[in-house]
UniProtKB/Swiss-Prot annotation:
The gene is ecfA3. It is found in: Cell membrane. This is Energy-coupling factor transporter ATP-binding protein EcfA3. ATP binds at G39, G40, N41, G42, V43, G44, K45, S46. Its EC number is 7.-.-.-. Residues 6-242 form the ABC transporter domain. GO terms for biological process: cobalt ion transport.
Length: 285
């Protein structure tokens, strides 16, 4: 039996101006895995995330967290936000304290934890995100990548069960992208945190994500593991997305260069294995 930490049932959300942002969303998020939400700008990803942790309340439908409907009382929402943390795309929208230590400690202080527990959690969060050496530095003096890590640490200090990140790799150089994704996967594996990301960086999805949902105009139109989702090439392209670069290369080799592949490989490792197998078969025949 599948273990889902979040269940979304017929979720609709309307903004006050009449915009119908989410339209009958049904979605199950597996506990302890990395899930990607894909889709163009304006399809409802951010609205969905804000419904997940109670910033917004559904117009209709419901969300279950840990198999219980979300409690929208003040106490219930405060508890929910300790368990489901959001890291925004632009860390400058999330950092507001004078120093890194003060900023990271904010959530723990707000939880009214004992001082020694606050110090312990902050130290652990700083160490986990690799920014212990920055703890006394003013937040406005940090690089963009460092600010991203501080924002993650500020959520991590509350020891959430779910960590939601809106475009976690946006604005980072290639090394920064790799480092931040490895950090997230490390937290998922070692702490058991469920990771949910919205991203336009298609190439990271088959490398780091277990599950994928594709959205269009407020609806989920595809879901599955990366191979299942990217096998729907026509649908992917119709919603202004693309295949991962390796997947596109394998598609070209098959359709234009006579290579024979059973499946569409999406990573370098998968592609090497398939091409070597094909090469050996040709030479042996």
């Amino acid at each position: 039996m599948e273990d889902y930490i979040l269940k979304v049932e017929e979720l609709n959300y309307n903004y006050s101006d009449g915009t119908h942002a989410l339209k009958g969303i049904n979605m199950n998020i597996k506990r302890g895995e990395v899930t990607a939400i894909l889709g163009g700008n304006g399809v409802g990803k951010s609205t969905l995330f804000q419904n997940f942790n109670g910033i917004l309340k559904p117009s209709s439908g419901r969300i279950l967290f840990d198999n219980k409907p979300i409690d929208y009382s003040r106490k219930g929402i405060m508890k929910l936000r300790e368990s489901i943390g959001i890291v925004f795309q632009d860390p400058d929208n999330q950092l507001f304290s004078a120093s890194v230590y003060q900023d990271v400690s904010f959530g723990a202080v707000n939880m009214k934890l004992p001082e020694d527990e606050i110090r312990k959690r902050v130290d652990n969060a700083l160490k986990r995100t690799g920014i212990e050496h920055l703890k006394d530095k003013p937040t406005h003096c940090l690089s963009f990548g460092q600010k991203k890590r501080v924002a993650i640490a500020g959520v991590l200090v509350m020891e959430p069960k779910v960590l939601i990140l809106d475009e976690p790799t946006a604005g980072l150089d290639p090394m920064g992208v790799s480092e931040i994704m490895k950090l997230l996967v490390e937290m998922q594996k070692e702490l058991g945190i469920t990771i949910i990301i919205a991203t336009h960086d298609i190439d990271i999805v088959p490398l780091y994500c277990d599950n994928v949902f594709v959205m269009k105009e407020g609806r989920v139109i595809l879901q599955g593991n990366p191979k299942e989702v990217f096998a729907e090439k026509e649908v992917i392209r119709k919603v202004n997305l693309r295949l991962p670069r390796i997947g596109h290369l394998m598609e070209i080799l098959k359709e234009k260069d006579g290579f024979v592949f059973d499946e569409l490989d999406l990573t370098i490792g998968q592609a090497r294995k398939t091409i070597n197998s094909w090469k050996n078969k040709i030479f042996n025949d």
